[in-house]
Regions:
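Long, low-hydrophobicity ectodomains and other hydrophilic envelope-associated domains
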Residues: 1-68
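Short, compact, well-ordered microdomains
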Residues: 55-100
């Protein structure tokens, strides 16, 4: 299983056809995650399709694509099917997303 990380976003290779709960719909834009601190966004460049599901976002790409962010190096990801994970900080008192 391949994984790619850009700041607080983890992109994990997934199996196609994995059953998903609830409604699956195309995302409204090319943004994976909006940054909390600066407002910059982790976004896709290329022909990849982002889908919103009850479990989070997925990416399906027939060709390599790029993930870009104003404060991180651009990463190139090969074609495939991926799950998008927003990484969280661990604290015994509370769970919160990693500040990017």
């Amino acid at each position: 299983m391949k994984m790619y990380r850009q700041g607080d976003v983890l992109i994990v290779e997934a199996k196609r056809g994995r059953p998903m709960r609830g409604q699956v719909k195309p995302a409204a834009d090319n943004v994976l995650v909006y940054g909390e601190a600066t407002g910059h966004a982790h976004r896709i460049e290329g022909d990849a399709v982002i889908m919103d599901t009850a479990e989070g976002k997925t990416i399906e790409a027939a060709r390599p694509f790029r993930v870009v962010h104003d404060e991180h190096d651009t990463i190139e990801i090969p074609e495939g099917f991926y799950r998008v994970v927003r990484q969280r900080e661990y604290d015994e008192e509370q769970i919160r997303y990693v500040a990017d």
